[in-house]
């Protein structure tokens, strides 16, 4: 089973992924937790290039670098894990590329879909949890954690985070467009709800999606 988590930066994906991983471990469910970009030696090196603020990368270059890390991760880690019936939890997948590079950066969506299909070997998540939060709220949340001023665009954050409110509004709207076209695999969550409440909703959704995870009823 492939589970993906999506949302703009500051939505709380990492918190929910950690909670889910803990429950799966306690229930004795074999699982693997990964992140994009990253997950392999090559992908982690590319991640540092993508996220370091001193590097300026074109929209197309950014897309191709993300796609390179994804191809490595899917072929080397995700597919082998799924073949052993492990649950794979992924912090971002190709929906992030659609939202960020497509709707955010303005890259042609038709070209984007071709590259996505090629780099993922047409792998589709079984369920995608989208944690929704307004960019303004996400920025306040992230800056409060980093003890930085609220002038988000001017803060010394990584290159992508410095894109600002307008960019993140485009990304959020892009996610809504994606969800409308593939409602069957998305579970939309209000990221401002208490983390424990969100966790319960995630477990309930997984139990319905995969009866084999009935062991999660105890948690």
Curated annotation (Swiss-Prot):
GO molecular function per UniProt: ATP binding; dTMP kinase activity
EC number: 2.7.4.9
Keywords: ATP-binding, Kinase, Nucleotide biosynthesis, Nucleotide-binding, Transferase
Annotated Gene Ontology cellular component terms: cytosol
PROSITE patterns xref list: THYMIDYLATE_KINASE
InterPro entries, per database record: P-loop_NTPase, Thymidylate_kin-like_dom, Thymidylate_kin_CS, Thymidylate_kinase
Record-listed ATP binding positions: 7-14
GO biological process terms, semicolon-separated: dTDP biosynthetic process; dTTP biosynthetic process; dUDP biosynthetic process
Keyword Electron transport attributed: no
Catalytic activity: dTMP + ATP = dTDP + ADP
NCBIfam families: DTMP_kinase
Cited function: Phosphorylation of dTMP to form dTDP in both de novo and salvage pathways of dTTP synthesis.
Similarity remark: Belongs to the thymidylate kinase family.
The protein's name: Thymidylate kinase
Species whose genome carries this gene: Chlorobium phaeobacteroides (strain DSM 266 / SMG 266 / 2430)
Name of the gene this protein is made from: tmk
């Amino acid at each position: 089973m492939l589970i993906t988590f999506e949302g703009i930066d500051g939505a709380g994906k990492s918190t929910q992924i950690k909670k889910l991983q803990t429950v799966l471990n306690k229930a004795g469910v074999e699982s693997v937790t990964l992140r994009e970009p990253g997950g392999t030696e090559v992908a982690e090196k590319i991640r540092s290039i993508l996220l370091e603020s001193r590097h300026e990368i074109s929209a197309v270059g950014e897309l191709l670098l993300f796609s390179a890390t994804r191809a490595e991760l899917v072929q080397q880690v995700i597919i082998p894990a799924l073949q052993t019936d492990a649950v794979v939890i992924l912090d971002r997948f190709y929906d992030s590329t659609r939202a960020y590079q497509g709707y955010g950066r303005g890259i042609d969506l038709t070209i984007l879909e071709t590259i996505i299909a090629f780099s993922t070997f047409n792998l589709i998540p079984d369920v995608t949890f989208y944690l929704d939060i307004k960019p303004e709220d996400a920025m306040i949340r992230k800056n409060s954690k980093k003890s930085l001023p609220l002038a988000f665009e001017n803060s010394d954050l990584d290159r992508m985070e410095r894109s600002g409110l307008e960019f993140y509004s485009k990304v959020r709207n892009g996610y809504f467009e994606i969800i409308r076209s593939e409602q069957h695999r998305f579970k939309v969550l209000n990221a401002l709800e208490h983390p424990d409440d969100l966790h319960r909703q995630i477990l309930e959704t997984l139990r319905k999606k995969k009866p084999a995870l009935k062991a999660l009823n105890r948690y």
